Amino acid sequence: MGIGDEKALKILQKVHTTFGVPTVTDIHAAEEATMAAEYVDILQIPAFLCRQTDLLVAAAKTGKTINIKKGQFLSPLAMQFAADKVIEAGNKNVMLTERGTTFGYQDLVIDYRGIPEMQSFGYPVILDVTHSLQQPNQTNGVTGGMPQLIETVAK
C-alpha cells in the first residue's frame, strides 16, 4: 500500500532541500507526471514502460529532465525512438539508462557495445549495474541476482 504518492514525494523534496542532491522518481502513468514534477528534479521512465508514448510525452511536458531506462527487450539503437518522443514534445533534457538485456529466460547481461551506441544520440548514458545483474523469476518465483559481481562489472 505504501505511504501515498504525495507524502513520498515530499520526503524526496526534503532530501533535495536538506542535502542539495538531485532527486529522481519513477512515474508509471501519464497522469502522475505533473504532480511528481512539483517535487523532484528527474522523472524516470521504467524499462517496461519505455515505449509508452503518452507517458514519455506527459513527462516531457513538465520540463524536467527525463531518464528513460532501456527495456531489456530493446536494442540500444531503439532507444533513439523513446528519446525522440521526449524531444518532439519540446524537452531536450534526456538521459538514457542501460540496465541489461534479456539473456535466455532467467538472466540479464550487459552488452557494453550498447553504451557508445546510445551515447551517439548525444544524451548522457547511465549504467545501472545492479539491475543488469538481476536474475528475474527464478524457479522459486523470486527474482535473484549476482550482487557479488557488482564491483567487477562496475569497473
Predicted regions mapped to residue ranges:
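A broad, low-specificity signal for short, low-complexity segments enriched in glycine/proline
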Residues: G4-K7, I27-E31, I87-A89, V125-L127
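Active-site loop-to-helix "anion-binding N-cap" substructures in soluble metabolic enzymes
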Residues: K10, K14, A33, T53-K61
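Glycine-centered small-residue hotspots that permit tight backbone geometry or close packing
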Residues: M1-G2, G104
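Aromatic/hydrophobic pocket-lining residues that form the small-molecule binding cavity
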Residues: D5-L12, Q52, M79, M146, ...
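Catalytic beta/alpha-barrel core
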Residues: G2-G4, F19-A29, D41-D54, T65-P76, ...
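Conserved structured catalytic cores and adjacent interaction surfaces
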Residues: A36
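Catalytic alpha/beta core domains of metabolic enzymes, predominantly
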Residues: V57-K155
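A generic structural signal for short, solvent-exposed coil/turn residues
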Residues: V15-T17, E88
